């Protein structure tokens, strides 16, 4: 994972205070604290056994956090999504999460293989980059922050790159 910068973590805190329920969540009626603590240990974070929520974990990292179990999104805390509402994806498999993105059908078709690679302990962690063109320079691209301005020139457009780091975790209690 990336070293966490204080100003970035503060921006995450502000965004969570503003839009918290739409940015994060977990599958209802599931105690995910053991999985969250397991992830915190794997990431070598300070005080991993004190983490009780996905927000606790996310506020220790620059990266947004999604936890998949058995191919389903169990918990998420994405403070700066690109025009989507993270909490709406809870309980969905990887393919369904990405149905509405560019080239979504290709991604949906490849999702079983992608999910397998993402959980492959032998492969270990990997980093990938996702890009988009947007009409706002703001870090938060949440749908509630939509910029109504229509770009007129190329100078009105912004290139946005997201870093995604995948870290497969060893199974705990029969789940991964």
Per-range role (PLM):
Residues 1-176:
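Extended, well-ordered protein cores
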């Amino acid at each position: 994972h990336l070293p966490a910068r204080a100003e970035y973590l503060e921006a995450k805190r502000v965004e969570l205070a503003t839009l918290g329920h739409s940015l994060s969540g977990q599958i209802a009626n599931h105690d995910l604290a053991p999985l969250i603590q397991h992830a915190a240990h794997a990431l070598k974070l300070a005080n991993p056994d004190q983490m009780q929520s996905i927000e606790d974990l996310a506020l220790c990292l620059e990266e947004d956090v999604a936890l998949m179990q058995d191919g389903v999104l169990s918990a998420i805390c994405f403070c700066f999504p690109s025009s989507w509402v993270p909490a709406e994806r809870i309980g969905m498999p990887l393919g369904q999460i990405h149905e509405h993105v560019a080239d979504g059908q290709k991604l949906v078709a490849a999702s079983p293989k992608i999910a397998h690679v993402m959980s492959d302990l032998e492969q270990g962690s990997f980093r990938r980059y996702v890009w988009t063109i947007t009409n706002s320079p703001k870090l938060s691209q949440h749908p509630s922050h939509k910029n109504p301005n229509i770009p007129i020139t190329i100078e009105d457009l912004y290139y946005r790159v997201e870093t995604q780091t995948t870290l497969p975790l060893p199974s705990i209690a029969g789940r991964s």
